[in-house]
């Protein structure tokens, strides 16, 4: 079980990313556009740097939705590998079967 503070911190980061996503996308489009003037590009870069660090999506950590475990996360289920195994053995994941060949 992850610390409650880490889970809350990650949720706060998700909210900040969502709040700043549109403006970040606009600034990145200005920076990447070949038709942008150098002055406008520098202005967009400085504005992007002024945004909070937590507004960057790479700072969000994928965590297990049940207990917040940060490692071994499977996107398909939103759970950690440990939790997927437990729930699959209990038959609580529809369509998941133990493999045999």
Curated annotation (Swiss-Prot):
Amino acid composition bias (Basic and acidic residues), ranges on this chain: 61-70
SUPFAM superfamilies named in the record: Glucocorticoid receptor-like (DNA-binding domain)
GO cellular component: small ribosomal subunit
Keyword check for Ribosomal protein: yes
InterPro entries xrefs: Ribosomal_uS14, Ribosomal_uS14_bac/plastid
GO molecular function: rRNA binding; structural constituent of ribosome
Stored HAMAP family: Ribosomal_uS14_1
Subunit (UniProt): Part of the 30S ribosomal subunit. Contacts proteins S3 and S10.
Protein name, as recorded: Small ribosomal subunit protein uS14A
Organism whose genome encodes this protein: Mycolicibacterium vanbaalenii (strain DSM 7251 / JCM 13017 / BCRC 16820 / KCTC 9966 / NRRL B-24157 / PYR-1)
Gene label: rpsN
